[in-house]
Every structure is written in structure tokens, then in C-alpha cells.
Amino acid sequence: KGLHSDAHFKPQWCPDHLLSRNYFGHLVVIRSALVKEIGGFREGFEGSQDYDLVLRATERTTHIEHVPRVLYHWRIHAASAALSEDVKPYAYVAAKTAITEALQRRGEPAEVDFLSGYRGYRISFKAPLKGKVSIVIPTKDKTEVLATCLHSIFNRTDHPDFEVIVVSNNSKDTAFFAFMKEMERLQPERFRWYENNTPFNFSALMNFGTEKATGEHILFLNNDTEVIHGDWMRIMHSWSQRPSIGAVGVKLLYHNDTIQHAGVVIGLGGVAGHTFVGYHKDGP
């Protein structure tokens, strides 16, 4: 008897998701030989010993499978962490230690912070940033919108080494060209713009801007975005320079603090769709 609630539909295997929380849960099957090889459960991780185990196990094998079916239910009772994170606070301390040690084993210096309410962790990588970031922004006029974007980048970004490349596609507004000259005057070392007056093709414009870039990392940005936090580019750069990472995305918000998207899921809505559209930015 009981009421089903808080469904947890788990995604496919993702090593970085596993660093943010133990999304494997309790129903996990591991070969006994592998469990013995890694030393089984360890003392000192009470409350999160299963998390520590799967972190170590997934470092020793690439054969990790996800069964996309609802196979078990987890009860919620007064003595369970399923009810509240306050029931077993030591479990989250142990989990933080397990993550920290996993990152140390992998040679990735990082700071691990517990996110109360989410029951997960934020990983801040501490390796020195290497290489310049080139921001490529396509536009057709939209002077006021673009001005908000560019001023927010230059006034709020605390990254030490970046450049901005604007690609104009068939712009006609005289105010736009005047603004481009003003930006060249204000940011002579970090700003350039080019005209590409071919028929509109978003991918072609991005490729054109990439050819003009001098950075080791390319950051594709729409002209209607605005920087909120100064460390935005440093965080993206710290992830993109990791050997296992090919591309990095971020959470985008509308002006009313709801989510525009927090990633793209293949298959959602038929082909692909944005996740968490309309949720509050700090929602669970």
C-alpha cells in the first residue's frame, strides 16, 4: 500500500552526472570479480558506501549498461534519507569525500560543494585555464539587442583571455555599423567583426566566424543573450579543456527567471527537445 511519488527516470550512463549525484540508486548489479578487485565497500563512507563503490567500479570498466524500465520502488519513511536530507546528514559528507577522492584518483583537482535541496554536488575544476576563448556571434542588425549582449560580456566576464567575433549577415541599419566602429574603438584587442552577405545559413555563419578565430576554444553565442555571472566563461572553459569533454552547454534563462532550456534531449518531442522549459531557475 502507498502512494507513488517523485519518479526518478534515470538517464543513460554519464560519468559526469555520476560525479554530481548517485543517480544509480540502490538497484545496481556489479560482477563479483570487479567488486573484489576494487576492495568492496570501504569503512568511513557510511551512508554513501554504495556511491563510493560505483565511483570506483566505473573507473575500472567501460561496460556499463542502463535498463530503461521501472524495476523497483523505494519506500519513504521517517528514518530514511528519502524523506529529508536532514535525516542522515553524515551520508552527504561521506558522498562529498567519495567524489573528492574519485577526482584525486583521476588527477583532476577540483572543489566539491554540496547543493542543499538538490541533494547533489557542484564540481569546480581548479586546473589552470589554457588557451584563448573565441566567442562567435552571428547577427543581422539588431543593434540594441547585440549591444546588451556585448556590453554584458566585456563588463561582467572575469575570464583573462578571450576575444569576440561578430559575423554580420546582410545588415542594413546604419546604427549597426556605427556601433561596430564604436566597439572596435572600445575593445581594439578583443573585438573584431566581419561581413558575410551570403544567403542566411546559421551553420555557415558559425563556420565563417570560426575560421576568423584565433582561440583554442570556440564559444558559439546568440546575439540575444546576456551574461549574468562573471565566472560563466571560466566555468565553461574549465570543463571544455578536460580530455573527456567535447562540448559544454549551460542553462539559459528567460528574463522572468524561468528556464529556456537546460540541455537538449534526443528523442524529446519526436526529434530533440529542450529540458525543463518553464521551470524556475532554482527549482528542484
Residue ranges and their predicted role:
Residues 1-4, 225-271:
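Conserved donor NDP-sugar-binding/catalytic core segment of glycosyltransferases
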Residues 3-24, 250, 255, 267-284:
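Short, flexible, basic/aromatic active-site loop/helix in glycosyltransferases
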Residues 45, 55-73, 100-114:
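Catalytic donor-sugar/metal-binding loop of nucleotide-sugar-dependent glycosyltransferases
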Residues 52, 131-136, 163:
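Cell-envelope/extracellular polymer assembly enzymes that use nucleotide-activated donors
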Residues 151-161:
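Short, acidic, metal-binding catalytic loop of nucleotide-sugar glycosyltransferases
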Residues 168-179, 198, 226:
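A conserved acidic beta->alpha catalytic loop
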Residues 196-213:
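Glycine-rich, basic loop-to-helix element that forms the pyrophosphate-binding segment
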Residues 218:
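Short aromatic/hydrophobic "clamp" motif used to bind/position activated sugar donors
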